[in-house]
């Protein structure tokens, strides 16, 4: 082998090794921690768009009892902008036969590690919910939702809103009357809550 070819060969091996290293790093990238400040329940931000469109003054039938059970609520967690970009790229590569990631599907756990909230952030949020008296029921494997349960009073105090009864086309509903608020420290991760609004099952005649 000539010296020139030897150098080229070594350079090629080095480049291939670097590519493998980069791809391995992409495959095993961990979600970074985004909650970096202490959680202060006095320093809040409102989450726009978290009030149901049917929760209007015309439909309002008054505040619910504070002890009303509110079960299986879902706190929705969001990805960082970098995670969203990486996810879009991966989705495109999974459909590209020329990509090394073609049809390389992720398990829910792998998805959570790469595109969900970090385990540290999940732990901080779960601790915050429990400190407020909620029961944390489960955390999705993809780390995009935390299921929790409590009472209307706990929801009102935790999220700085009121839970009201509403009547819409003859059907009873329960929903928050205003957009919810959360501690500012949780803003980079928390997107909102699912199931604060639900329809009341009609009682049998």
Model-identified regions with their sequence ranges:
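Bacterial N-terminal signal peptides
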Residues: 11-25
């Amino acid at each position: 082998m000539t010296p020139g070819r030897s150098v080229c060969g070594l350079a090629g091996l080095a480049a291939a090794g670097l590519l493998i290293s980069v791809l391995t790093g992409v495959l095993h990238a961990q979600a970074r921690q985004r909650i970096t400040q202490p959680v202060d329940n006095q320093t809040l931000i409102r989450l726009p768009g978290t009030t149901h469109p049917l929760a209007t003054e015309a439909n309002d039938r008054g505040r619910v009892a504070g002890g009303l059970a509110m079960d299986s609520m879902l706190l929705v967690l969001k990805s960082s902008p970098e995670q969203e970009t990486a996810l879009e790229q991966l989705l495109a590569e999974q459909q590209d036969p020329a990509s090394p990631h073609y049809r390389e599907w992720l398990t829910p756990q792998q998805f959570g590690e790469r595109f969900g909230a970090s385990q540290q952030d999940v732990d901080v949020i779960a601790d915050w919910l429990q400190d407020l008296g909620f029961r944390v029921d489960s955390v999705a494997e993809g780390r995009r939702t935390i299921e929790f349960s409590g009472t209307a009073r706990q929801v009102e105090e935790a999220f700085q809103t009121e839970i009201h009864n509403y009547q819409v086309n003859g059907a009873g509903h329960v929903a928050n009357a205003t957009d919810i608020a959360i501690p500012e420290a949780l803003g980079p991760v928390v997107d909102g809550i699912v199931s604060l609004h639900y329809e009341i099952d009609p009682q049998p005649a």
